[in-house]
Amino acid sequence: MKKYLIFFSLIILCSCNHLAGQEIRSNELIKTTKWWTVQFPGKPQKDENAKLMSLIKVKGNRFVNSNGDTVLFRGLAIADPDKLENEGEWSKELFQRVKEMGATLVRIPVHPVAWRQRTPEKYLELLDQAIGWCTEMRMYVIIDWHSIGNLKAGLFQDPMYITSLTETFDFWRTIARHFNGHNTVAFYEIFNEPTLYFGQLGSMTWDEWKKINEDVIKLIRAFDKETIPLVAGFDWAYDLTPLNYDPVNAEGIGYVSHPYPHKRTQPWVPKWEEDFGFAAGKYPVFATEFGFTLGKSTMADNGEYGKTIIKYLEERGISWAWWVFDPAWEPKMFESWNDHTLTDNGKFFKEAAHGFPK
């Protein structure tokens, strides 16, 4: 009982801190004799290279470039830029290493706690650097609002994921306004992993979740009519079965699945097809996060899964992004910042991203 009391106390404390943080930030904005001049962060970015890369669009069930050619992304997630900068590892060299791994896209996870603590103004500076480096190296970008939980109930898996509907709307207003027209930023992943955690995070129906996403998309489109919103399903962004009867009412979007190996037992393929793969016949689908099993990240434990999932995704025309290019976050892809020795998880991605030996 004591453990649960501590857990709920932490949630209440973090929620109060979140609300207090919003109030403090609001007060800081008006601590000026010319308070009427204060504006919200995220004014449109001015980047002469914004159109350097081809604009990615949705055409039927595919992502295509400006020539109409189908694009299948092989992406790689980095850790949160705030974490990396605090550790002294935020640099152009990091993105060069990601490029060398074979990635054509970088997924950037923005945690709500980091967004608040650094402040949106300062966090945008990190994102601007990332977009600049990715443009130079010809890698596209997903900006991911990296929360896990029930956005409707306001209950989340861990304190770092605590956010609110208001903050989520404000985040996407800020991001869409700032990166509108920048072709490198191809995708906005609206919410990382919606989950009810077997009822421990309250209740939310698909219809309620669909409506939240539709409202976010409308807000994004008020500022940015080109970048592609990505919508996740329940079960930690794995399950897309509601698309069978009630897809999101929006054009030019994609859907997300996170098909980690623990989600289903063998035989995998028919279960993947039933749970999310079927959707790729009608809509663009992007497996934006998965990797080797947590705590068992060896080829011996994951080799068969790895080759099977990549083969399945690519035959289905589903773009994918591996998790995570970091030596601390699991499943890690290299051992340390000192020597960058790849783990089996890292070696596998590099081989897969380069198309496997023929």
Where in this protein do the model-derived segments appear?
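N-terminal carbohydrate-binding accessory modules
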Residues: 21-105, 234, 278, 351-355
